[in-house]
């Protein structure tokens, strides 16, 4: 699929997950919850820690859902993860795979903070069927060029085609306004480790006919 910001969208393969984790590490380096959870003051070290963390996270999500990428030429520049209804939360095996990435090479207490963060989000996960959006990230050097909007537009087209409910979490106020443009509304707010978080839902539309 081509978009008006000259990118192509496609589903990621397992071999694409490492470059996707690199993008997440760079793009989400300064997200407030990530800063608080990993407690690494040096930005580059924090970026590398997040890359290690997201490798097993993406592997699990790849098995439970879909991960779409945005490409310029052959370069991956954005990702959009989606968990299928009923498969939002990581399995016990996934949690074990993530554990070394948060225990080794990170400050003492990082693992416990990540667990508390994950539990806080899981506790608020809607009971009804829904597609769970996230993570969504764009390579920092090409942000604000319409790539995120292209990914979200494609996501919403799929949701509307099935009349499906979508749900997400974010720790950035700017993201709240971004997602509202695509029909999401805030359904709850809470502090997670002292960081404001917003929980958003998008109602299911009418399935397309034909």
Regions found by a protein language model. Give the residues of each.
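Conserved active-site alpha-helix within GNAT-family acetyltransferase domains
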Residues: 149, 161-162, 172-189, 193-196
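Conserved acetyl-CoA-binding loop-helix of GNAT-fold acetyltransferases
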Residues: 138, 144-157
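Conserved acyl-donor/pantetheine-binding loop and adjacent beta-alpha core of acyl/acetyltransferases
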Residues: 76-137, 143
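Conserved N-terminal entry element of GNAT/NAT acetyltransferase domains
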Residues: 1-18, 22, 26
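A short helix-loop-beta-strand connector motif used in the catalytic cores of GNAT acetyltransferases and
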Residues: 48-69, 128-132
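Conserved beta-hairpin
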Residues: 63-80, 139
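Conserved GNAT acetyl-CoA-binding A-motif
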Residues: 129-131, 158-171
